[in-house]
Amino acid sequence: MVIKVILTLIFILVMVGVGIYSRKQASSVDGFVLGGRSVGPWLTAFAYGTSYFSAVVFVGYAGQFGWKYGLSATWIGVGNAIIGSLLAWIVLGRRTKLMTQHIDSRTMPDFFGTRFDSQGLRVVASVIAFVFLIPYTAGVYKGISTLFEMGFGIPYEYCVVIMAIFTAVYVILGGYKATAMNDFIQGIIMLFGIVTVIAAVLNSQGGLFTAVQKMAELPSDTDATVNGGFASLLGPDPWNLLGVIILTSLGTWGLPQMVGKFYSITDEQAIRRGTIISTLFAFVVAGGCYFLGGFGRLFGMPPVLPNGRLDFDSIVPSMLITLPDFIIALVVLLVLSASMSTLASLVLTSSSTMTLDLIYRDKKSAPGEVEEGAIDDIVAEKIERRKVVVMRVLIVFFIVISLMIALNPPTFIAQLMGISWGALAGAFLAPFMMGLYWKNTTTASVWACFVWGVGITVINMLLGNPINPINCGAIAMVGGFVVVWLVSLFTKKMPRNTVDKIFECYD
């Protein structure tokens, strides 16, 4: 227990120290939100990876999908690396950096408002982002707290409050630069931790080959006379597995907190280097998490919840509980790192969106600050400082709201994530990507995709999820491209000279 406490205290002190160190660079909006658009490839790649993989993945998804699909769940991690990281950086990285810098966009809602010349899109996009990031944040709290209860015996309520306080401190102090620096430190812990944990868990089962053989001997859930499904290449349910891969891999392309990493990177050379770093990070962390979760059935049946469903969130903790204290301490730091980095990214994204796209969207100054229609440098600096203060206040507000949900958590972690990813990526992915590439994308098509992505997700939830939330999210994302394309064919195009000026950044 002493080892676990010491390592955790050191970790928290380092995180807060980085926030204090970075506070001078967080005095302006660009500095607070984007790190001055000068963050290097290593910090950006690790910020992308650590925001991608949190306790939602390590505890929720790895446990649930490892139980359902066995060792074939590893394909989810492979998809996350190839589609969610490699292709995301190749397809979105350069164009996002160039266009957002060219049109002076700081957030995804700001991009929609400027690219499609619609303040209405900007406002609605910011509301969608703010509302649907809350359930994802609550899921992050739930995941880390499950591990803390196992490792320290600390009640769930204390865990979420402690985590929220320390995350708020370093984000409020240092903004994006502090978040990126901490993400790098946390990413190193995650890489080392996942490799060590996999080795320890497999060793407890007699080694890799013995563990795989045990998995091959397990009977199928649908037919007890059939063995081997949980150790096969595609697993017992390949079609639903594909839905999970699409949601968790393609979904990142439309999430504001993920795409925002491309806004802040320094230049095109850094993007090329960051692509490689981010992909390798995802292979190790995501591939490792799902590979580990694939062995969950070797550790007994999980508890049954009052609603009659299995408690999938308990599977990974049950695999780790018999490990030595040092390994458990490493696991706690691993998940704490993953969760705090994701939480920091989420609250920073939400607060910046609310501040820049709702409160200050028309860039108004206070009465008496404008003389003869011009804002001088002193006034402009004053407005910038005020925006940063508002963002810091909203960080506290967002954390409190998500904390209240986390203290009374609905449904499973994976379903929470499925709802938020489905709505956000279903609404944003297609219009964002096509807005970067296709000049004929219309404003009406973006509105249609917002309605499509949010509508299908919410209606499915209100009807009691007749379509699995994971599959519904995948349908929302893929269908969004059809919606944007079809509506763009039959609706009014933007003025050609306006669009050409926006696309000058690629010349």
Regions found by a protein language model. Name each.
Residues 1-507:
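Membrane-embedded helix-loop-helix hairpins and adjacent transmembrane boundary segments
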